[in-house]
Amino acid sequence: MDASAVRDQFGIAQDALVIGMVGRVNAWKGQGDFLEAVTPILKAKPKAVAFLAGSAFEGEEWRVDELEKAISDSPVAGQIKRIDYYSKTTELYNLFDIFVLPSTNPDPLPTVVLESMACGKPVVGYRHGGVCEMVKEGKNGLLATPNQPAELSKAIQELADNTEKREQFGKASVKRQKELFSLQSYIRNFSELYKK
């Protein structure tokens, strides 16, 4: 899918490197760690953009206010975009060059990772929860020690600096998602079990 129209919609240059995350704004989705991790990268790459998408639960809108304040106080605020929940998530994944899952607690089934993989994105996340099954480290993504934003930043940086590696990882993500996590693979595996 061509992301140029989506980039135009959000005012992002066609040649900008976009590092993105999609997640509910809550105590453990890791928006704070994400901002901490991308800040040095954005400082070093003035054309790069960090993109956050997600809303808070009803009654917890104050979390969004806190996040907005953290963004506006950031030394790279001009390179950070944040939107509320966006129904056309495929458009967002196609907008991103790197997908990040910075959840500070283990997420047993982060479907956002599978969705980004299906869109051919390399994944960076913390080494806990379901992402460890989805990402084959060094093949379609990189994992960092949980709750270590500096290490997360290093992993993002590695992909930010290497277009070829991003493309290789992206292709591997599509292949891995189809082979192991698609509906077709589920049906195939279920059929094999049933035959036994």
Label the model's feature ranges.
Residues 94-108, 121:
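Acidic donor-binding loop of glycosyltransferase active sites
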Residues 122-125, 135:
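Short hydrophobic beta-strand element within catalytic cores of glycosyltransferases
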Residues 1-12, 67-69, 189:
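A short helix/loop element that forms part of the nucleotide-sugar donor recognition site in Leloir-type
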Residues 137-138, 142-149, 158-164:
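Conserved acidic donor-binding segment of nucleotide-sugar-dependent glycosyltransferases
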Residues 17, 21-40, 150:
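A conserved mid-protein helix/loop that constitutes part of the nucleotide-sugar donor-binding site
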Residues 64-84:
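Nucleotide-activated donor-binding/catalytic signature segment of Leloir-type glycosyltransferases, i.e.
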Residues 8, 151, 158, 165-179, ...:
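A short, well-ordered alpha-helix in the C-terminal region of glycosyltransferases
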Residues 85-86, 92-96:
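Short alpha-helical donor nucleotide-sugar binding micro-motif in glycosyltransferases
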